[in-house]
């Protein structure tokens, strides 16, 4: 089966690029979460569709009729991964999200479409999507063999842009980064380390009062130091800004690192304080406790889906530091291993259910 994977690469690719996907050829390089996501999709394709030829196409371009002709030469199109429903990473007049395609051209795609674990990533305070978003997403949902989002909140948000009769086509399907440790088989280690991933991009969108936020995080790191914990600042990309305001015991740079290093790093963390999506998902998938200063709705949505929303605190809460301390202390009293095992089993069961559905649909079309 010839699969075309459409997505947004972290690496700088020409907008016209199509790249063969395989070992040693990862089109996502740079931001640690994106690298992990690329590796997770590569692993997923190899495991579930052995022998298939996978080609990656950059979605961040203005698509033409020629591009549709190229797409239609493949057996199936998989729109995959990440927060594609966001306009500011590739502003365009075609769709108002990261795939620069008009509704008219979407209609001309003749091969089966699978939308796999995408996210509604509009930041708080950003303008609403325009009518082109509504039109293209409606067509995409209509045409999709399977349409899935990586958290329920994204699904609820998408439903506001499409007719009610399409709502039943929206499925929850967690990001495949949550299952990539199947490949690495890393065991979570008991340590006294607390990692901090404090996103450094779009600071004005994330924080109403950056000085207050830094002060509250410092209150928490001071507490951790007093009780003998090692605080480690972790950089996914642009995430070292806080070291000027907060003293950490160590810094680990995962920018440009391969996915295995990211997973190895988190397997040696007891707790991760995170306001990036993959800095929630990957550590949790390895057994880490997670605490989240919520600066984006997707962070809350993930916690809602794993039924741990008490461990998310709004970033502009004037008592953020004290609440982090309180929730950290609470986590130490919980049977976290049991919580982790229960949630991961549910995530795996949902993955299997969705993948079995996808394979059945493809089989009905004589694609396998």
What does each of the following model-derived ranges do?
Residues 1-368:
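Active-site anion-handling motifs in enzyme catalytic cores
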